[in-house]
């Protein structure tokens, strides 16, 4: 599936990056579709069922991201207007309650996490990722953790080009 897509308003490097990510996600989706089809009618324990549900959920998330990238390649970027999630490729700088300042890279799919950079990677649909959406630098943002609510100060947001 290598179709040439004309994009308005995207630099060549950004378009190439998005096209490469789109191809990678489509390959992952194709593999997952086979696994999900094989899951149907499977008899197994609760762990197998949980893995099947996780694969189906990931397939839905991949579909959303593929549609977003396809749209972005066809029409160009849309201004960030505080949607429900930060776009993949966004860089956020946060100050945590202990004073630590961390720059994190937003990803859409967990498999995009660079090896060795797990601590600086933030998934867009995580509690913190969703809480940051719609906020501006200078805002204090509250998000849920297993230990209860936590807060960070959003220092900077750099959207993907």
From Swiss-Prot:
Disulfide bonds: none
Gene3D superfamilies according to UniProt: Transcription elongation factor, GreA/GreB, C-terminal domain
A Pfam entry, by short name: GreA_GreB
MF annotations from Gene Ontology: DNA binding; RNA polymerase binding
Biological processes per GO annotation: DNA-templated transcription elongation; regulation of DNA-templated transcription elongation
Domain of life, source organism: Bacteria
SUPFAM superfamilies assigned: FKBP-like
Protein name: Uncharacterized protein Mb3817
Species per Swiss-Prot/TrEMBL record: Mycobacterium bovis (strain ATCC BAA-935 / AF2122/97)
């Amino acid at each position: 599936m290598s179709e040439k897509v004309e994009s308005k308003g995207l630099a060549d490097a950004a378009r190439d990056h998005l096209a490469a990510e789109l191809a990678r996600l489509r390959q992952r989706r194709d593999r997952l579709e086979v696994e999900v089809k094989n899951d149907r009618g499977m008899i197994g324990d609760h762990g197998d069922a949980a893995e099947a549900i996780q694969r189906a959920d990931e397939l839905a998330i991949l579909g959303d991201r593929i549609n977003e990238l396809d749209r972005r390649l066809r029409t160009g970027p849309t201004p960030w207007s505080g949607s429900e999630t930060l776009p993949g490729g966004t860089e956020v700088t946060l100050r945590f309650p202990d004073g630590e300042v961390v720059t994190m890279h937003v990803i859409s799919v967990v498999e995009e996490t660079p090896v060795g950079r797990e601590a600086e990677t933030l998934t867009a649909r995580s509690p913190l990722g969703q809480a940051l959406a719609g906020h501006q630098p200078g805002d204090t943002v509250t998000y849920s953790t297993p230990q209860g609510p936590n807060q960070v100060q959003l220092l900077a947001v750099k959207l993907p080009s």
